[in-house]
Amino acid sequence: MPRRRGSSSSSSAAGGSGGGGGFGFSSLRRELHLHNFFRTSSPSASSTSRTPPAALPPRTSAVTIPGSNHKLTSSASSYHPPRELTVSTFSAGSATAADGLGGAHLTPSLSSSVHARRESFLYRASDDLREASSLRPVSRASSIASNEHGHGDDLIVTPFAQLLASLRNVRSNLISITNIQNSDDSRHANRSAKRPPLHNIELPDDVVHCAHDTLEELDWCLDQLETIQTHRSVSEMASSKFRKMLNKELSHFAESSKSGTQVSKFLITTYMDKEEDEPSIEIEVPTEVQGPSTSGPMTLSILKKAQTAAMNKISGVRKLRAPSHDGHVPEYGVNCAREIAVHMQRLDDWGPDVFKIDELSKNHSLTVVTFSLLRQRNLFKTFEIHQSTLVTYLLNLEHHYRNNHYHNFIHAADVAQSMHVLLMSPVLTEVFTDLEVLAAIFAGAVHDVDHPGFTNQYLINSNNELAIMYNDESVLEQHHLAVAFKLLQDSNCDFLANLSRKQRLQFRKIVIDMVLATDMSKHMSLLADLKTMVEAKKVAGNNVIVLDKYNDKIQVLQSMIHLADLSNPTKPIELYQQWNQRIMEEYWRQGDKEKELGLEISPMCDRGNVTIEKSQVGFIDYIVHPLYETWADLVYPDAQNILDQLEENREWYQSRIPEEPDTARTVTEDDEHK
């Protein structure tokens, strides 16, 4: 669609040239003596009178959160007009306040006290960021969520959303300075709040024409920016900014103690993917010990043979087990102790005791949880899934999970159940199709199948066959997908047999995109994607988040499985402690193996040099909290209980950090066996 342009006469006016009608903005400023208006405008004149915006046209249908003005939309749901969300911009008389925050200010039409909660590092202003002309520390805007709940004013930290806020502020100031009528187009009515004019001077016609054309240009720019996909390019600005902020935070954290240095190194090497255009991080990360050089012809030949062998066979796929149910499928897929019913009734809750479920199901927690979730959602009937075939697949899937302390089928069951609860958020219940829900729960169930108990970096450093096969890129995640779909090729396991070819392709694409998002090195990118999407909608004044495109939906689904994979610190403290003990034991076993192979021991993997309490506080502060904070903003008022539990768990570990570095409790061989 060609861009709209102003008329030739008004373009001449805008340029300040042509005939006697030329009237540039410098002339306008001089003619209106704006400095006098700024100096003499009273508080009442510069205050904001809030009015509700016009509803957006029903381009897509919408889902309403009970008690909230926040909606997510998809083509499958019904449309509801949005509630009031008012927009306030700083007047020229309050420029100092605006400059201090770095942008526009949107506020809900109603205000009430909010429960104070600690904010993550993303909201901390930095002098370093202020000095960079391309980065703005913070702007402020209202939540896209409920007025009744008093979600209050939120800081805008992603660059794309700050750009929208700044342009909306410019638009509002233009209307106030020129005193022209706002656009009658309902799409633009929510971009500026009505307020008393700065003056009552009748401007020359050419000035009015110029102002109208400028307003039209701004509206066109905002139209394009507000509809742009925030999934990648613009969110990469936020990702780069968040990396810089996290590096700065972790450099301070590292200075606090020796254990702080190790925790910081671990967080950087695990949760931050490496960008070639990024400056080197402030914390010196130990150089990984590399394997033998691959420059020689003999070595290249060996690697080529290994790669060929790996490509010819998907490792880890063992002989499939025959069905054990004889056609009759028990209530939970397999025979379980009667007491399991109490725990299975809590599958809709955040944090059922999955360890107890595993015990009462005779070590079939993944089968009983996944089977029950799909049955509860009526997906057996929707997709004509044969229950016996599904159980056969799930039992073989469990069989292909290794006996690791952490990355085992109990963890997979926990992630699948967490996905189910996240999908139950009122804002999401009508957004995703049944096929997308099926794929999401399946992705949670298979996301770590045949995990060896070692990290991607270890596999790369040790020249593991999988690293060679997948070219060091998301090595484990690609392997999990290969094994999961290889199992589906057996006719006894293909519970998707009644799906159409198109449905199978869609299912496979969703699962692949989701499981690849469980690569922890993608954390900052996933956080930036989600944060940018949420904040862009706030600034745009839209209380409707459109999810009618695949990229928008998969962005939310990828965030969900990443949330579920990092959900341990948000669960009841007893479960959190058990998961923490398990992951630490797995890390230590990797450290033992690295020591045996002569590799440098990875951060947090030296069993004789780990401060558990401080590592968990750092993990929550810099990884888990910012992610869940952003998610809670998206699904508000849902997930507030999750944030509260996360805060309680943080305080539990914080209170147990030894005060003196020299008396810090470190884990030793004796501690391991206590």
From Swiss-Prot:
PROSITE patterns: PDEASE_I_1, PDEASE_I_2. Expressed in dorsal D (DD) motor neurons and several other neurons at the L1 stage. Expression in DD neurons decreases gradually beginning in the late L1 stage. Highly expressed in adult ventral D (VD) motor neurons, but diminished in adult DD motor neurons. One of its GO terms (cellular component) is synapse. The gene is pde-4. It comes from the Eukaryota. It catalyses: 3',5'-cyclic AMP + H2O = AMP + H(+). It is an enzyme of class 3 (hydrolase). This is Probable 3',5'-cyclic-AMP phosphodiesterase pde-4. Belongs to the cyclic nucleotide phosphodiesterase family. Its EC number is 3.1.4.53.
